[in-house]
């Protein structure tokens, strides 16, 4: 059996690596004597995984983790005890038993919010941001260049970002990017900067925004949440 947990990654802990985050959760599980299931083989380890790890420096209120158990536990008690030991910024918000397929197979899209700072507005005073975003939304082809593996080498290839980028929206002084996820890949947040700078009159870089991952979704349009 397994439980699916929704948790936050905020504040200075947005700079903790994926491996360190996994180690943090494992230690906290052991401290609370949670009956976690271990893998088999010569090097057994706790059976748990975090879906689509965040890049360093990005905050989120909607991260997901699967934990396999040997026996059922009281989930309310689990939430209280885990959060008592986890550092500020990491908090398990919800937990439920889940016998469905792995969460990695459920996720079809991701939504990022590029929260615009004063430096952005200083550089884009006379720009209609919503109108510029609509330019991207109306295009069939938005060419990007990125590295792909070919044999033992990595080469630069040109791709159409619209295969992954569903839409861009301006909401509450933030640019929301709705991005499809598939077996063939997705779009990293950094590529959104290239798209905006190359295909619109918007001038933006990483110093102009605070970046947050809003959530992972079960549909390609970023509407159906994992926890319903």
Where do the protein language model's features map onto the residues?
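Short amphipathic alpha-helices in soluble, non-transmembrane regions
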Residues: 78-86, 124-139, 192-193
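Short, charge-patterned binding micro-sites
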Residues: 38-67
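Extended, well-folded interaction surfaces typified by the phenylalanyl-tRNA synthetase beta subunit core
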Residues: 6-12, 16, 20, 31
């Amino acid at each position: 059996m397994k439980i699916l947990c929704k948790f936050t990654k905020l504040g200075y802990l947005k700079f903790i690596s994926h491996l360190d985050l996994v180690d943090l959760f494992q230690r906290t599980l052991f401290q609370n004597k949670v009956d976690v299931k271990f893998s088999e083989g010569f090097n057994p380890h706790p059976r748990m995984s975090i879906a689509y790890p965040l890049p360093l420096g990005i905050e989120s209120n909607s991260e997901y983790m699967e934990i396999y158990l040997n026996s059922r536990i009281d989930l309310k008690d689990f939430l209280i005890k885990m959060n008592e030991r986890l550092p500020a910024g990491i908090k398990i918000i919800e937990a439920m038993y889940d016998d469905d397929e792995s969460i990695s197979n459920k996720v079809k899209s991701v939504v990022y919010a590029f929260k615009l700072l004063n430096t952005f507005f200083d550089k884009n005073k006379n720009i209609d941001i919503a109108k510029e975003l609509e330019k991207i939304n109306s295009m069939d082809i938005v060419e990007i260049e990125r590295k792909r593996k070919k044999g033992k080498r990595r080469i630069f290839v040109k791709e159409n970002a619209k295969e992954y980028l569903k839409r861009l929206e301006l909401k509450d002084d933030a640019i929301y990017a709705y991005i499809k996820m598939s077996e063939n890949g997705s779009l990293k947040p950094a590529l959104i900067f290239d798209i905006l700078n190359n295909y619109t009159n918007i001038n933006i870089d990483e110093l102009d925004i605070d970046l947050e991952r809003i959530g992972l979704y079960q549909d390609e349009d970023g509407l159906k949440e994992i926890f319903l």
